[in-house]
Regions:
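Terminal-region recognition feature
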Residues: 1-177
């Protein structure tokens, strides 16, 4: 019985959520089957990412995470679904946290919605901070700095090991497949 792969490749959006969700439903029928979540993503929707995190967290199957390439923004939260000793990254991968921004998807911004959007962002920050605190060795100060003040905080593989973000750095992905 081989390992089942769940890919989080590319942007985190509704399509990614649906893809992961259908795979999770399928895997609930075989809770003994090992799952590898392969991540190479620059992030995307915080809401969809938290949904993916929640789906994977309740999946009873044993989980491993492989960061191969970029793991940025909300993808970093998804990467924390497995126990630290089951989280891996390749040497050439990056892990980066950044501060959120107000959505500016349209040319003119309706400022009457700013308070609602800021309140929503603060709620998301609290949820993200709680996950980083419980799943890594990052200090509250470092998390606050990354989420609220820095435009981008990049972690090398060495720092990921030291801070409990990953448990092992792989020379080759063959080491886990």
């Amino acid at each position: 019985m081989g390992k089942e792969i769940i890919n989080v490749i590319g942007p985190v959006n509704e399509k990614t959520f649906l893809s992961v969700g259908s795979k999770v439903l399928e895997l609930t029928k075989t809770p003994e089957k090992e799952v590898i979540v392969v991540i190479s993503s620059n992030g995307g929707s915080v809401t969809m990412g938290l949904g993916i995190y929640d789906l994977l967290k309740v999946l009873p199957n044993p989980k491993e995470v492989l960061i191969c390439g970029s793991c940025i923004s909300i993808a970093t939260i998804i990467a924390l679904v497995a126990p630290v000793e089951k989280r891996y990254m390749t040497k050439n991968s990056i892990f980066a946290i950044h501060s959120s921004s107000v959505s500016g998807d349209h040319m003119s911004f309706d400022y009457s919605h700013l308070n609602t959007e800021l309140s929503f962002m603060n709620g998301n920050h609290a949820r993200l901070k709680k996950i980083y605190l419980s799943e890594t060795k990052l200090s509250e100060k470092k998390i606050d700095k990354a989420l609220f003040y820095d435009s981008l905080t990049i972690f090398s593989y060495e720092k990921c090991l030291k801070k409990g973000i990953v448990g092992k750095v792989l020379e080759s992905t063959c080491d886990i497949f």
